[in-house]
Amino acid sequence: MERLLDNKFSIEDVHEESLRPKTLEDYIGQQKVKEKIKIFIEAAKKRKEPLDHVLLYGPPGLGKTTLANIIANEMGVDIKVTSGPAIERAGDLVAILTNIGENNILFIDEIHRLNRTIEEVLYPAMEDKKVDIVIGKGPSAKTIRLTLPPFTLIGATTRAGLLSSPLRDRFGIIERLDYYTVEELSQIVMRSASILKCDIEKEACIEIAKRSRGTPRVANRLLRRLRDYAMVKHTGSITYEVAKSGLEMFEVDEYGLDLVDRNILEAIVYKFGGGPVGLSTIAAAIGEDEGTIEDIYEPYLIQEGFLVKTARGRVATQKAINHIAKIKFNVKESGDKR
């Protein structure tokens, strides 16, 4: 079953390509990053040069891929999209690099997952526009150095710390994308609803934004599910009341936490006395993968002040303890009424 608040890319997101902004002007949020990128693009165009290599990092779902496509659009060049896990051999990367058109963009998502051997192919390509290919095998094999046309590499990662220093140092532009504000997300929801031809109240947009974990991808996914809910259970319009009842049915609370988030906090608070407790122990307690907890759930819980990461393990904050106690009380109260 798909996790509604998952900020990872899903197949459904492919079908909502129309929701992606195409220009910096339409791109909502990340104001400081946008201002800098706009200057870099204008300067590159005036010099008639490709944009310097760009590294975009930050939590999933914040618009790194969208921004890469916007940069290509603003530069008036083509973009080739691939990902770290998809490039399995050095030859795969060489083939991509030798087929890039002049001043075009190569976008590598999850660039931190590139194999180190493959990564080394990028070093001369990024610095000197050169790439080495080996022809033949054994003692008779020869290395030929090819010259590449000028190009821009845009790398995106959720784990900037996993990038090797030699690779990271070759990016001239490094920008972090941060979580969005409620106001920014509300604007994104309103824009998406307009594109989807979905009738929605401003208050409903704000309610969706509050529960979207600071992430546009989550906001758009909640909007699509509420569109279904409003169509089947109500008149089709998403009012504040419809949004609130739908989100409650989807078990997304006022902080944007879902059942898995609450399971993590409950385990720390009730099973381990509030912590500190190790990641592997939490994973075993709730039946979830360690990497999934660390990459998908923890960043938002830490950002919102529910969790603290210490050398001895994870610790639940007073905010988390109060929130979990409130949920338990509400569940007990509704059970007593029945």
From Swiss-Prot:
InterPro entries: AAA+_ATPase, AAA_lid_4, DNA_helicase_Holl-junc_RuvB, P-loop_NTPase, RuvB-like_N, RuvB_C, WH-like_DNA-bd_sf, WH_DNA-bd_sf. ATP binds at residues 19-20, 61, 64-66, 170, 180, 217. Residues 1-180 are annotated as: Large ATPase domain (RuvB-L). SUPFAM superfamilies: P-loop containing nucleoside triphosphate hydrolases, Winged helix' DNA-binding domain. GO terms for biological process: DNA recombination; DNA repair. Its EC number is 3.6.4.-. PANTHER family: HOLLIDAY JUNCTION BRANCH MIGRATION COMPLEX SUBUNIT RUVB, PTHR42848. This is Holliday junction branch migration complex subunit RuvB. The gene is ruvB.
